[in-house]
Amino acid sequence: MVELKMPCASLVGRVLRPGITTVAFMLLLASPRPAQAQIDFSGVWQPVYQEDVPERLAGPALRDYVGLPINDNARQFADSWDPARITLPEEQCRVHVSPYIYRGPTMLRIWEEKDPKTQQLMAIKHYISTYEQTRTIWMDNRPHPGPNAAHTWMGFSTGHYEGDMLVVETTHLKQGWIRRNGLPMSDRATMTEYFVRNGDLMTHTFVLIDPVYLTEALVKSQDFTRSTREIPQQAWIWVCEPVVEVDRPDGEVPAYLPNEHPFKNEFGEQNYLPEAAVRGGAETMYPEFQSTIIEGRRSMTPPKPPPPPAPAAGGAAR
């Protein structure tokens, strides 16, 4: 039987809960671990879609911010979001930033680069088929560059091992998204990742800190399985060529002005959720918020039941 080592629960407690819980988990991660061989993550990995299939494939509804620690800046940005924006030639091939790219459909190839003379591990490389991105995680203790260094889609990443867990710190990210419905991530965001391998299963957990758009850390995780079959070459190629999909005047960008979004109430009404829940915020992440949802629903009009079926021609409905 394979023993699963799942860091997610401890990580959530460490970064999201203040006080005793935070201190306890920080001491736990900082405590000495027995020396052991570093885990090799090399191989071809495929994403596993479980309970978050609707989130990661079909995508979230417009103005669904439930359970996300966003602030008013993020809400204002996302409230103006028009999905038609991605039809712009400038947006069609825009690369996903590293905190977002692992969550979508992709193939992942991992390999190690070692010094040819000393065989010391210098870097871990990730080739991500989505937008054909090669990401470098430096393992040679080099420092991160200064604040004026260039920002990239993948950012600048350094890693180290804590026992059998690979910990990666990433800075110098370009502005991107944390969700497909327009919730943004700023270029001041930083990310800490935790990679854990159990046989042919790899769990990737990331903690995102963004002083511009988040009030607390955003924690997400996804699983990958190691592929043992040969992957066709075309699966690694992301063909993207911008074209004009919709004729528009030069300089026009699809967007909505404040409070003019035609679907601003749709998600809450369809899912019978009060505005306090729909608008998100750190408080909506915690179990205690359930009482707010229950109380808010009491003042809402229940959704109307569907109409009865129309009577058959020439007779009454049964």
How does the language model describe each region?
Residues G13, R17-S31:
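Bacterial N-terminal signal peptides
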Residues V2, P34-R318:
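PEST-like low-complexity, intrinsically disordered acidic/proline/serine-rich tracts
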Residues M1-L16:
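N-terminal secretory signal peptides that target proteins for export/translocation
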Residues P7-S10, M26, L68, T87:
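Helix-centric, low-specificity signal for extended rod-like, repetitive segments
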